[in-house]
Amino acid sequence: MYLWFQERDLNGFASHFLSESLGEMEHAQKFADYLIARGQSVKLDEIPAPVQTWDSIEDLISYSFNMEADLTSSLQQLYSISERISDTRTNVFLDPIIDAQTKSEDEFANILGKVKFASNQPSAILLIDSDLKKK
């Protein structure tokens, strides 16, 4: 996603997606560290290549928003399971991750709303790009 925007000289969008990807790597590391601290092994399976082509900025942002929403749902399911089995330690671990994930989902919803409102008008897209560059 970063590359898709970078190739189109939309540096604000590109920067936002680069930052998001680094955040996701940090979360993955936290999960691995947590599992290791609990005496578990971390098994990394092959990850299929991500989607790399979209018809429009709106399609890409919509795809990203749906990924964020799915991740939020998965984290909430994990939390529910740990709550049901009285695994307080896992709940405490998940609390800040779920908070950050919810904020990320909200941010993508906001960006998606702006992109939809812009209706592929180049000047409006450039304003959104500029706004993202400032963050």
Residue ranges, per PLM feature:
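Iron-associated oxidoreductase/ferritin-like identity signal
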Residues: 1-135
